[in-house]
UniProtKB/Swiss-Prot annotation:
It is found in: Cytoplasm. One of its GO terms (molecular function) is aminoacyl-tRNA deacylase activity. This is Leucine--tRNA ligase. A motif ('HIGH' region) lies at residues 40-51. Belongs to the class-I aminoacyl-tRNA synthetase family. It comes from Chlamydia muridarum (strain MoPn / Nigg).
């Protein structure tokens, strides 16, 4: 029989859909397993090979766990709000909803063609009003707890896009989306008080089964620093400075303020006002990421003002520099160039004093003044001495600071969740009640923002201006919308109870499914999405509406998919099919020498691979197998279409083997042993997520198995069941062809038995007058008398009417009866 994936795959995809094979149930008699992909933004480009890696991995685990008897939740949805759809709407006039629905339909078809076992009954998009009704409700929980507030904030503002951008949406002073100039402005924004949960967010990391690199990124992002607040007296009052090194206090030779510091105008001398104002303006065009990047030179300007050193009373010059950020500590730092690399660069740039106060072995030196003395103390001893001194003299105190800033939550966009608040002229506001949700945006034709700091919603006066029946006052609806992060902060909870119209989730369903047992997605989400989701979850946990302190038990980041790119230096990339190899070098059609690299797949580099093309040529099962075989799940991997072809050839061989006339109802030990060993290896690989070695295990199995004169049917069935998680279509087909009922997962996961793994069973040949009459699987340790008795019983019909004149016995090999 010939293996034709185009017929097999469509057939079984239809079967799974009609039978609702993957519908999850809250079955209290079963152990639950919740496996989740980081759901995608439904872009127009659709599914790419990078998606395949993570999605195939979670699907293998989901299918395996179902076969093992778990109640499995494996859902998929759409992170569908966002800037790209809105920008497309501005360019074309197409409503973002229309674009999004079209893209989702395309994405769904592609996912179906890969045979992913999602519970389609739980599907939703974050832009569905039925979903964002609850996003709005959860925002109001944060508001009621004082965790959502409005404040004037220094933000990244893009005039061309007309909206505020996060630091991650800005690169080298330009927006990632569109490449437009970005500037710093003070705008009134909604902010979430994530800093109130800094300690919980830090502490919770220790209990998570996450990559250590991700946990460290979050620790660094939160940036807990233990130190001291030091008060430096100026002509205009006390200047508070935070330091993690109070032991170096005597080594201070200058102070540096962030350009946004509220005392800048007050402290700046008349002679320096023009140059300081110019510097502050220049800083506004830089993102915070640019400002704190490691550079060999530092910029800054002297204010003309001085502060008194709290110990020596010496005058300390006060400077302004963009490497100091207002959101960390107090927005002011003390410059100790002898013991801080950034301070050293700054001091060298502006010829400021460098005073060494700590020896190479960490002991304080040159740190005496009157009754103040640190000399000879270790770093920790000196820190405590200084803190005691500061507190005793009302010059400061011990302090803990965080790099983490409150989360800027406003966006001046149309395609996002409207913030459910009404504002009044007296400055007060009213959060909407549950029966007023969802707050829907109005239908509009022009998606461009309305002036600085105002989104497109501000244009629709009949929507903005309302008479509030609750307060009997005229009010205005909030015209800012939530960021794309809002919907993805809690979507994993909605999957527990996706279509509940009375609550975001039912308590008993959340308690059954949470936490997520396995969460797979890209490392680019290591901080923001994962940190924001943990923040919301911990708020909910503190409020008593979720049962677990953390949302994601185990996290795995899949590696990047690389592909060969071909570039004409100084010109650009060409398609791979246009490049040709000559004498070990790659040449363009016009004869130019090409720069050949392995780079991340992208449209711009022309090195992407369309999954549909691969599926049409090789079949989804072959693509799935190669997606895992290409390399360890968490490592970068080089894609090769030849590798997919190799997996297709393997599936051809496997299909031929399983449908061969050599498949017999005979449990030959060699065949059973190969099958049991295969099952054990595949089981171990899936449990350890070493999914790249599964394919090689199958290849080794079939190479040995086809050497057998007979293929034991039980062994073939075991191999087919073990193949099902990674190549489900061919496995379902073969399972039926072997005489079983449809639905291979119902057969359960095959169990590897020790006797077949440890070599304690051997297969012996039983002959009569030298002719093969039977095979027996017996214990390796069986004595001769026992083996002969079993052999005689197995060939009794051939011995009838004759007399056994001689019995030839070869240990663990054969018994031959001569009659």
């Amino acid at each position: 029989m010939r293996y034709d994936p185009s017929l097999i795959e469509e057939k079984w995809q239809k079967f799974w859909k009609e039978e609702q094979t993957f519908r999850a149930e809250e079955d209290e008699t079963k152990t639950k397993y919740y496996v989740l992909d980081m759901f995608p933004y439904p872009s127009g480009a659709g599914l790419h090979v990078g998606h395949l890696i993570g999605y195939t991995a979670t699907d293998i685990v989901a299918r395996y766990k179902r076969a093992k008897g778990f109640s499995v939740l494996h859902p998929m949805g759409w992170d569908s709000f966002g800037l790209p759809a809105e920008q497309y709407a501005i360019r074309t006039g197409t409503h973002p909803r229309e674009t999004t629905e079209k893209n989702i339909a395309n994405f769904k078809q592609q996912l179906t063609s890969m045979g992913f076992s999602y519970d389609e009954s739980r599907e939703f998009a974050t832009s569905d009003p039925e979903y964002y009704k609850w996003t709005q409700k959860l925002f109001l929980i944060l508001y009621e707890k004082g965790l959502a507030y409005m404040a004037d904030m220094a933000v990244n503002y893009c005039p061309e896009l007309g909206t505020v951008l996060s630091n991650e949406e800005v690169e080298n002073g330009f927006s990632v989306e569109g490449g437009y100039p970005v500037e710093r402005r003070m705008l009134r924004q909604w902010v979430l008080r994530i800093t109130a949960f800094a300690d919980q967010l830090l502490g919770g990391l220790d209990e998570l089964d996450w990559p250590e690199s991700v946990k460290q990124l979050q620790r660094n992002w939160i940036g807990k620093s233990v130190g001291a607040s030091v008060h430096f007296e100026t002509e205009h009052g006390v200047l508070e400075v935070f330091t993690t090194r109070p032991d170096t206090l005597i080594g201070v030779s200058f102070l540096v303020l962030a350009p946004e510091h509220p005392l800048v105008d007050l402290l700046t001398s008349d002679e320096q006002k023009t140059i300081v104002a110019q510097y502050v303006k220049e800083t506004q065009s830089k993102s915070e990421r640019d400002r704190i990047s490691e550079m060999k030179t530092k910029s800054g300007v002297f204010t003309g003002a001085y502060a008194k050193h709290p110990v020596t009373q010496n005058p300390i010059p006060i400077w302004i520099a963009d490497y100091v950020l207002m959101g960390y500590g107090s927005g002011a730092v003390m410059g100790v160039p002898a013991h801080d690399d950034r301070d050293l660069l700054f001091a060298q740039q502006f010829d400021l004093p460098i005073i060494s106060v700590v020896s190479e072995d960490g002991v304080c030196i040159n740190s005496c003044h009157e009754d103040f003395s640190l000399d000879g103390l270790s770093g920790e001893e000196a820190k405590q001495y200084v803190i005691n001194f500061l507190e005793k003299n009302n010059l400061g105190s011990a302090k803990v600071a965080y790099k983490l800033r409150d989360w800027l939550f406003s966006r001046q966009r149309y395609w996002g969740e409207p913030i459910p608040v009404i504002h009044f002229e007296d400055g007060s506001c009213r959060p909407l009640k549950d029966d007023e949700l969802p707050l829907l945006p109005p239908e509009i034709q022009d998606y461009r923002p309305e002036g600085v700091g105002q989104g497109p919603l501000a244009k629709v006066k009949e929507w903005v201006n309302v008479f509030d029946s609750e307060t009997q006052k005229e009010g205005k609806r909030e015209t800012h919308t939530m960021p794309q992060w809002a919907g993805s902060c809690w979507y994993y909870l909605r999957f527990c109870d996706a279509h509940n119209s009375c609550a975001p989730w039912a308590e008993e369903k959340e308690q059954y499914w949470m936490p997520v047992d396995l969460y797979i997605g890209g490392a680019e989400h290591a901080v923001l999405h994962l940190l924001y989701a943990r923040f919301w979850h911990q708020v909910f946990y503190e409020a008593g509406i979720v049962s677990t302190p953390e949302p994601f038990k185990k996290l795995v980041n899949q590696g990047l998919v690389l592909s060969t790119s071909y570039r004409i230096p100084g010109k650009g990339y060409i398609a791979p099919e246009m490049a040709k190899e000559e004498n070990g070098q790659w040449i363009s059609p016009s004869g130019e020498l090409l720069d050949v690299r392995q780079e991340k797949m992208s449209k711009s580099k022309l090195n992407g691979v369309d999954p549909k093309v691969l599926i049409d040529e090789f079949g989804a099962d072959a693509v799935r197998m190669y997606a895992m075989f290409s390399g360890p799940l968490d490592k970068n991997k080089l894609w090769s279409n030849q590798g997919v072809a190799g997996c297709r050839r393997f599936l051809n061989r496997f299909y031929e083997m399983a449908t061969s006339s050599r498949v017999k109802d005979e449990d030959i030990f060699e065949g059973m042993s190969l099958a049991h060993k295969l099952v054990q290896r595949v089981t171990d690989d899936i449990e350890k997520l070493s999914l790249n070695t599964i394919t090689s295990s199958f290849m080794e199995f079939i190479n040995e198995f086809v050497k057998l004169p007979v293929y034991p049917k039980n062994a073939v069935e075991m191999a087919v069941r073990a193949l099902a998680p990674i190549a489900p279509h061919i496995s379902e087909e073969l399972w039926v062809l072997l005489g079983n009922a449809s639905g291979i997962e119902k057969a359960g996961w095959p169990k590897a038995l020790p006797e077949y793994l440890e070599g304690k069973i051997v297969t012996i040949v039983v002959q009569v007058n030298g002719k093969l009459r039977a095979r027996l699987d017996i214990s390796k340790d069986a004595i001769e008398e026992e083996v002969v008795a079993l052999a005689k019983e197995a060939v009794s019909k051939y011995l009838e009417g004759g007399v056994v004149r001689k019995t030839i016995f070869v240990l663990n090999r054969l018994v031959n009866f001569v009659i």
